[in-house]
């Protein structure tokens, strides 16, 4: 995703959850973290197959580090990765013109305020409930109980994200045709999934 999309989703995730109060973060530093991985060109391609260690390391940093400055930045970086994990351009190995076109059009539509999360949100919620239940949490979608039984919270969060990424790819497989890079529907889907996952993972980090 382009920087404006990362910033917009990061801001919404912050406003629509208790992240800001629970973590006592610096908003400007957090927002910089939301775009930082795209500034450092040494980083690998931002899909879930290329960055599992980096993602888990940042989850662990949120648990161990007490510095408000570092935690604010790290949370933003986590949100950046989540946005890219649920963006088709980062999942279909599209490195060239189509990737660039998709991001440019998304940026344009965001500026015109033509993009809002679509009705796939209910489907995302049902997949999330399945994801939590699939990890043998007694058939409940109570995420706090799920995490209490886990020793390595960072690994478990990553596995939930990975599960959801697989569901996302299955969902968009039949929808994304040759013209996916200009599809407004695909942009709606990506924004819906990205925002939902940023909110849920943010809640898990503070659990």
Which residue ranges define each predicted feature?
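N-terminal leader/auxiliary helical segments
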Residues: 1-77, 82-207
């Amino acid at each position: 995703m382009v920087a404006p999309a990362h910033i917009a989703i990061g801001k919404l995730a912050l406003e629509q959850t208790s992240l800001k109060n629970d973590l006592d973060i610096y908003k400007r530093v957090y927002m910089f973290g939301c775009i930082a991985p795209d500034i450092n060109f040494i980083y690998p391609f931002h899909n879930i197959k290329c960055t599992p260690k980096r993602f888990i390391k940042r989850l662990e940093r949120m648990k161990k580090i007490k510095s408000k400055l570092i935690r604010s930045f790290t949370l933003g970086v986590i949100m950046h990765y989540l946005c890219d994990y649920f963006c088709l351009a980062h999942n279909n190995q599209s490195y060239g013109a189509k990737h660039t076109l998709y991001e440019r059009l998304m940026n344009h539509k965001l500026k015109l305020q033509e993009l809002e999360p679509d009705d796939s949100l209910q489907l995302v919620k049902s997949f999330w409930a399945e994801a939590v239940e699939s990890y043998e949490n007694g058939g409940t979608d109570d995420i706090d109980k799920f995490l209490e039984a886990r020793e390595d919270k960072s690994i478990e969060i990553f596995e939930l994200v990975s599960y959801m990424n697989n569901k996302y790819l299955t969902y968009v497989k039949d929808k994304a045709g040759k013209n996916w890079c200009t599809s407004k529907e695909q942009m709606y889907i990506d924004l819906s999934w990205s925002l939902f996952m940023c909110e849920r993972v943010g809640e898990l980090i503070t659990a």
